[in-house]
């Protein structure tokens, strides 16, 4: 029998008596703030393109592959994470993410771009996926009385990673140089620094004992799986899963397209004006987008508790389409308008990620919702290819045709508007899951009575 002070046989080390659950959010943040560096990849794009003679499409490839591997490793590694626990998952994330930078450093030093793609994109991408899902699940277990806040904390950290990485990466490139040697040194420092920072999370993380104290009631309560739910396998057979897949894919495609190209995009939009954007200012813009991304994850997901998941996605997708139209039509006329619209879009992008677990819970219940979430993240993998591909391919073709400035992005912004409309329609098609898909978990406890007004509200959220 495992005691609270000894490592659990499955699921990793269990917290000893008296262990504060408030030590767990910093552990989760140390992982998510590190792997959130992926959102600052656009800072490296100009240096890679000039130092290694790459096109915009080529310089986006490591980022695209990293997002693909994030979704795939999250989808297929979820069972391993649950079986081996958060410390194992965080260790794997640390090793893969840091090694990815070290391999990329070797690739930059030897001008072998395929090593950068392999290191950052493939190896580092596995670290992204395993690291992304491990703190979310653990925090939900530690905070059964505040699951929305717990999810927001973890996913907010991922969104805020570039807030630190963007100016830090830009400063290193300024110091080391933007040639292949400077890029290699920057990658090397990133790999070593993130290894140290992520190790703090590995050391701090613990899984909760069987009972977690509810701070509001002061009582210790077990939180079992109750009532009916939908298994991960059955969820794949429902139209609701695929509607949400389209919703997430469209929302992420629209956000990730502008995020991956953020630094060069704002520079190109105002290159021909009296107030061009410097490299440092462009990096600052990326940091602002990361702040909006981070704030949206906790702000909009909390708002969804008040107005419902379906309504909040109506905001993400409907208002987001309007923001893209404003940028495409008037973005080059006003720098504040461009920045404001981009910030709103990135807040919706982050909010979409943070709200989707609750949306899944509303539709499919808590039984195997983590596995369902992991499978849904394949939409992120798809979007990680679509978004940058659309923006970069169109920009490259426009540049080859002799266009410059905002003309490089007009068509891609219009495409993003259309994708958000598709996502809006998919969200409108979401309905409650048919009872034939429900199963009773083998370890389920009798469900507590649900007040009628709350039951009706939860049902309405899926309408």
Regions found by a protein language model. Name each.
Residues 191-220, 423-431:
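C-terminal membrane-cytosol helix-exit motif in multi-pass small-molecule transporters
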Residues 248-257, 281-356:
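C-terminal transmembrane helical hairpin of 12-TM major facilitator-type secondary transporters
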Residues 48, 129-143, 150-151, 351-364:
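Intracellular juxtamembrane helix-capping segments at the cytosolic ends
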Residues 158-209:
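Helix-loop-helix hairpin linking two adjacent transmembrane segments in secondary transporters
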């Amino acid at each position: 029998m495992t005691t609270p002070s000894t490592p659990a046989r499955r699921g990793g080390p269990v917290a000893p008596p008296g262990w504060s659950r408030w030590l767990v959010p910093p552990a989760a943040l140390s992982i998510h703030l590190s792997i959130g560096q992926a959102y600052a990849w656009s800072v490296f794009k100009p240096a890679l393109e000039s130092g290694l003679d790459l096109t915009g499409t080529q310089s986006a490839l490591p980022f695209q592959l990293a997002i693909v591997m994030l979704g795939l490793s999250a989808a297929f590694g979820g069972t391993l994470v649950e079986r081996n626990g958060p410390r194992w998952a965080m260790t794997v994330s640390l090793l893969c993410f840091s090694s990815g930078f070290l391999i990329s450093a070797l690739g930059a030093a030897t001008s072998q771009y395929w090593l950068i793609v392999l290191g950052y994109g493939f190896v580092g991408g596995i670290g992204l996926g395993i690291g992304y899902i491990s703190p979310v699940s653990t925090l939900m277990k530690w905070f059964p009385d505040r699951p929305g806040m717990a999810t927001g904390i973890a996913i907010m950290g991922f969104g805020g990673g570039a807030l630190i990485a963007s100016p830090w990466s830009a400063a290193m490139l300024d110091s080391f140089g933007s040639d292949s040697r400077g890029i290699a040194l920057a990658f090397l420092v990133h790999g070593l620094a993130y290894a140290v920072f992520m190790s703090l999370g590995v050391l701090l993380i613990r899984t909760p004992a069987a009972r977690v104290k509810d701070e509001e009631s002061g009582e210790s309560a077990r939180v079992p799986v109750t009532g009916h739910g939908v298994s991960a396998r059955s969820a794949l057979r429902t139209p609701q899963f695929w509607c949400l897949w389209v919703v997430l894919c469209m929302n992420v495609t629209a956000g990730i397209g502008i995020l991956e190209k953020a630094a060069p995009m704002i520079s190109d939009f105002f290159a021909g004006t009296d107030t061009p954007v410097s490299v440092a200012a462009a990096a600052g813009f990326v940091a602002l987008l990361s702040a909006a991304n981070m704030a949206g994850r906790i702000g909009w997901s909390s708002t969804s508790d008040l107005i419902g998941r379906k309504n909040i996605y109506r905001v993400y997708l409907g208002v987001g389409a309007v923001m893209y139209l404003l940028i495409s039509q008037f973005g080059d006329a006003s720098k504040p308008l461009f920045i404001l619209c981009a910030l709103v879009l990135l807040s919706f992008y982050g909010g979409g990620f943070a709200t989707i677990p609750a949306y899944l819970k509303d539709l499919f219940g808590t039984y195997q919702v983590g596995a369902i979430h992991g499978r849904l993240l394949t939409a992120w993998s798809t979007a990680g290819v679509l978004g940058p591909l659309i923006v970069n391919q169109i920009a490259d073709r426009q540049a080859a045709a002799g266009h410059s400035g905002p003309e490089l992005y007009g068509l891609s912004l219009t495409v993003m508007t259309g994708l958000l409309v598709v996502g809006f329609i998919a969200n409108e098609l979401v309905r409650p899951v048919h009872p034939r898909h429900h199963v009773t978990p083998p370890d389920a406890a009798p469900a507590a009575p649900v007040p009628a007004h709350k039951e009706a509200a939860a049902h309405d959220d899926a309408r």
